[in-house]
């Protein structure tokens, strides 16, 4: 059965569990919550923030005209596929699924698929995404803060989200759009 996991989840609150192994396979978790999950519940952890997205099944960077066909990802310690600064990608039968007969509860510890700063067409067809700990897909660009306007053609920028560490935001020849942080206009 599915339970109201929000009653027991610390996502977004910065709560961490203190864990102590009492016996082989028996762990006591101390929490601030008044309610505890029902006996028999399965505890699933994504791992420590900023260290839980380091092992995608596939990483694509600066590539184009790709076809991922009839691929099954059964587990990854991050996304099933992350594509950055690439173009024209087709997923046809790219499945993020539990292996048949597996007793695992999780496929990927993040999104099944993630496309960042890609261009052209991204096609997803005949795919199944299940049991991941985040979204089926994310397709987006990237925001960065303008730190300084150098001249009419140059800016200095800074990234601010922890997942953007060492991220290649732009290159010579790229065009950027300046928007207001509050209105995105």
Per-segment meaning from a language model:
Residues 1-74, 99-105, 130-185:
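Extracellular polysaccharide-degrading/modifying enzymes targeting complex plant/algal/animal polysaccharides
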Residues 44-45, 65-70, 88-94, 121-127:
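All-beta strand scaffolds that present successive hydrophobic residues in beta-strands
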Residues 76, 110, 115, 120, ...:
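Interface-prone segments of viral and bacterial extracellular assemblies
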Residues 79, 89, 135:
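Glycine-centered loop/turn positions within well-structured domains
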Residues 87, 109, 133:
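Residues that flank catalytic or metal-binding motifs in active/ligand-binding sites
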Residues 114-125, 130, 139:
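Polyanion-binding and phosphate-handling cores
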